[in-house]
Amino acid sequence: MEATSHPAVHPVAVPPQFQGAGPPAIQMKDFPGSPGTAGGLALRFTQFGFSLISLCIMVSIAGFSSVTAFCFLVATMVFQCIWSLCLGALDIYALLTQRSFRNPLIVSLFVVGDWVTSTMTFAGACAAAGITVLIDNDLEQCGPNHCGRFEAAAAMAFMSWTATTLSFCLSFWLLASCR
């Protein structure tokens, strides 16, 4: 007795039409918060807002430039503001033209940029928080210094770092899903 097989997939009357020589290319999925989406734009403006608040707080303190860690925080916040504003403009362009960033080369640029700015922001926030703890707890010289403002600037930098790290993770996930 001969065994017969029954196909699991029923035949299609007309085969699908391919444009080009091979099967269709694999498309990247749009995750909420990925570049070129409304969530991505919200993340960019969140990064920009927190870093701008941190920058304004630090610049409003008269003697911040005498401490290297505070100067580094200001430099990283300037860099974070520029990066977030530029990518926010790209997100606005993508939303207005109804395009998305599905090119792996462009997404990898976002991934590397978010990774670098995230690392710099975290380092600046940690350095500023460490010096603030030193001034407040160890030296007990918080009276003449502006510890509350230093703490607020470091907290805003940490919030900016959180948004940048989330953006990095989503962009990295988008990049990994296309391969």
UniProtKB/Swiss-Prot annotation:
Parts of the chain that traverse the membrane = 55-75, 76-96, 115-135, 155-175
Q: Where in the cell is it found?
A: Cell membrane
- Keyword Cell membrane listed? The answer is yes
List the signal peptide residues: none
Q: Name one GO cellular component term.
A: plasma membrane
Topological domain ranges for the Extracellular compartment: 136-154
Q: How does the record say this protein sits in the membrane?
A: Multi-pass membrane protein
Q: Out of the domains of life, which is the source?
A: Eukaryota
- Please indicate the ranges of residues that lie on the Cytoplasmic side: 1-54, 97-114, 176-179
> What InterPro entries does the entry give?
CASP_dom, CASPL-5
Query: Which keywords are on file for this protein?
Result: Cell membrane, Membrane, Transmembrane, Transmembrane helix
UniProt record similarity statement: Belongs to the Casparian strip membrane proteins (CASP) family.
User: What PANTHER family would the database entry show?
Assistant: CASP-LIKE PROTEIN 5A1 (PTHR32021:SF1), CASP-LIKE PROTEIN 5B3 (PTHR32021)
Q: Quaternary state and partners of this protein?
A: Homodimer and heterodimers.
The name on file for this protein is CASP-like protein 5A2
Organism, by scientific name, is Physcomitrium patens
